[in-house]
Design a protein with these regions (language model features):
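Feature recognizes metal-dependent phosphohydrolase scaffolds
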Residues: 2-7, 11-21, 25-682
């Protein structure tokens, strides 16, 4: 409520007199009652002074542990092999643990072999054992080394947290090996006996795998995915499967993620776009094999409709694995779904004039007799004029065959169990932005005016800007899946398409999506997409501070972590903007961008010592990583070093624990004052 409104409300309250006054005493009594009920509930969990006191001691000890390591990845674009490898090596975090433990006591080659074993234990072990003359000795040496690294990785966690991370099969033995036993006079003999037994009973292989996976898990405490799991790469579904098993994760949706969410919700514009992008990059296997979506009706329609059409405007990008016949088939499907997409989008634009996208409807601006497009007062020669399914009098209407295909695809997307599970995960773990440990995470941009103020955007008749715009769009994405009211659900579905390509969308942030122009017009100036002013203000501290405050952060010491835009390192561009206040960490996993950027992108580590930015060389392959031990070469640099090591007490979780300690201290006071009686326990 604005200050003026508050004053007016106060004046109105005075005019009403005593009769209209709120019963503040009743409110206070209700608050007291609520607090009493809360303490009663807390007393059920901690029924004695001893139990409450012990929990306070435990929580206080956690507050003083080193902060867990956060790992930030973005713009994975379906490149599952590179993603999986970076996840395994923690952007160099595993190697740092190995260096911490062994220093100069192991050769560089031995350290690299140990790191590769931790990343790919089963595969690497099978290769080593093929040539190893004394496997039992190798098992023992390797187990001792892995135990040492695992102890280091576990050192910042409570015993309780480590216990929860242990694989059930080896939980007891691992706990013994990882825990320092001060009560034993001959610890070496004790540990050696355990290791000898593991080897003697034939469980060394399984134990090495379990230890390696535990090191991976303990090295990174929490994973942030700052958008775009989906796009042009071949395995977004594999990445989603991997993410769903990760121990602690959040996702900030990217534009491609929301596109697939819209497709899963049955939004036809999103469905057509998702299929078109798969076709464009030769990844229709994602749909057919990954999600079991039947594309045969589309393929049959494409052959029948474009049988003699070479479809030269719809050639594949970035895929050399197709035969000539497969490539021809793919191009015809690519054209068929593209024309369907332009029609579907035309229907959405007509349905929602408030989206302000009328200028993106271009089919009715084609002069079919002359083969030209009239746009922005100019005429452009069309590169392709074979449109047998487009009626010049009603260009956005589906033919009966197209309508049937889209109805089938809509059912297929909405009834695909695996796709729906993936989208439920994105809804549960994801959002348009995240504020976490004094960092603001989002994909794309905060829509701004030319003067750096927040741009006001109309969404279904109401205006929003800044954080409020993010919140309402996030809300409509969820409505698109769960709203009971059919009208609201339909609005939510269409809003996902809006988020995908509207200039006012935080996830797009360009004046247009020039898909049509890129296919059909040779003039490069028509392909240009002008970015939101946000992208020109990444070095403007005043603007960045305004954004941080808008999302509830004090600018001093806070950071914005931003995905979406590839950083052109080869041209000298830095991912650090405004003295490190904003970090652009497009992961660069997509091979298509690597020629443009010069590297394979950036990832970020935030541990108890500060922020570490890792710049990666391209990933060759999983096979090369195992056989040649060719880890992704990464150059790491400290972006922000903290003079005092950060503890759990300095984090968001720490603040929650401090609140819990306060509540427990109130419970203790209630016990000591006699307001609540201790429970009798035998």
């Amino acid at each position: 409520m604005h200050n003026g409104h508050r004053k007016q409300a106060a004046r109105d309250w005075v005019k009403k007199g005593q009769k209209g006054r709120p019963q503040t005493g009743g409110v206070r009594e209700n608050m007291k009652s609520l607090q009493a009920r809360y303490l009663d509930r807390l007393a059920e969990l901690y029924p004695t002074i001893a139990a409450a006191s012990t929990e306070i001691i435990n929580l206080e000890s956690i507050l003083n542990l080193p902060k867990g390591t956060e790992h930030f990845l973005t713009d994975i674009h379906g490149e599952y092999e590179a993603f999986s490898h970076v996840l395994k090596n923690g952007s160099g975090s595993v190697k740092r643990k190995i260096d911490d433990v062994f220093g100069n006591t192991l050769s560089r080659q031995d350290k690299q072999s140990l790191a590769t074993l931790i990343y790919y234990p089963a595969e690497k072990m099978s290769r080593i054992l093929q040539t190893e003359k004394n496997p039992d000795d190798w098992y023992k040496i390797t187990l001792y080394r892995l135990i040492a690294v695992c102890r280091r990785a576990a050192s910042k966690y409570t015993r309780s947290k480590i216990r929860k991370a242990l694989p059930k099969e080896f939980a007891y033995v691992l706990e013994e090996l990882l825990t320092e036993r001060g009560d034993l006079q001959d610890k070496e003999s004790y540990y050696d006996a355990i290791v000898q037994t593991i080897v003697r009973v034939g469980r060394a292989k399984a134990f090495i795998i379990a230890l390696s996976e535990l090191i991976q898990r303990l090295t990174v405490d929490h994973l942030h995915i700052v958008g775009d799991i989906y796009d042009r790469g071949p395995g977004p579904h594999i990445i989603m499967d991997k993410m769903m098993t990760y121990h602690s994760i959040d996702v900030q949706w990217g534009n491609h993620d929301v596109l697939w969410m819209g497709a899963a919700a049955g939004q036809m514009g999103c469905i057509a776009n998702a299929i078109r992008i798969c076709a464009r990059y030769g990844n229709l296997d994602i749909l057919e094999d990954g999600y079991g979506i039947n594309l045969l009706p589309l393929a049959t329609f494409a052959i029948n409709t474009y049988g003699d059409d070479p479809c030269t405007c719809f050639q594949l990008k970035g895929s050399d694995s197709y035969s000539a016949s497969e490539r021809e088939m793919n191009q015809k499907m690519h054209k068929a779904i593209s024309i369907i997409q332009f029609k579907a989008e035309g229907q959405i634009i007509k349905r929602h004039p408030e989206f302000g996208l009328e200028k993106r409807n271009l089919l009715h601006h084609i002069d079919f007799e002359r083969g030209v497009l009239e746009m922005d007062g100019r005429e452009y020669k069309m590169l392709d004029m074979n449109f047998p399914t487009v009626d010049p009098k009603d260009p956005y209407a589906f033919t009966p065959e197209e309508a049937d295909i889209m109805e089938r695809l809509e059912r297929a997307f909405m009834n695909c169990e695996k796709l729906q599970q993936h989208m439920k995960f994105l809804l549960a773990k994801g959002s348009l932005y995240k504020v976490y440990n004094n960092n603001l995470l989002y994909h794309g941009c905060v829509p701004l005016n030319e003067d750096g103020t927040f741009k006001e955007v109309e969404i279904y008749g109401k205006k929003y800007k800044g954080k409020a715009l993010y919140d309402i769009l996030d809300n409509y994405v969820r409505k698109g899946f769960v709203a009971v009211d059919k009208v609201e659900r339909e609005k939510g579905r269409d809003m996902m398409w809006y988020i995908w390509l509207n200039e006012n969308s935080p996830l797009f942030g360009k004046d247009k999506m020039a898909t049509f122009e890129r296919y059909f017009l040779a003039e490069k100036e028509t392909h240009k997409e002008i970015k939101n002013p946000y992208y020109n203000m990444l070095e403007n501290e005043e603007v960045l501070d305004r954004i941080l405050r808008e999302f509830g952060l004090e600018p001093e010491g806070a950071h914005i972590i931003n995905g979406h835009v590839p950083v052109k390192s080869k041209d000298g561009e830095s991912p650090l903007k405004c003295g490190g206040k904003l970090l652009v960490i497009d992961g660069g996993f997509s091979r298509a961008y690597q020629k443009e950027t010069g590297i394979a992108g950036y990832t970020l580590i935030y541990n108890s010592y500060g922020l570490i930015l890792a710049a990666h060389d391209p990933f060759e392959s999983t096979e090369a990583a195992i056989e040649k031990e060719s880890d992704i070469h990464s150059e790491s640099r400290m972006v922000k070093w903290v003079p005092e090591r950060k503890c759990v007490g300095d984090t968001d979780i720490g603040r929650e624990l401090k609140e819990k300690i306060k509540d427990l201290e109130k419970l203790l006071n209630a016990y000591y004052s006699g307001a609540i009686a201790e429970k009798f326990t035998r």
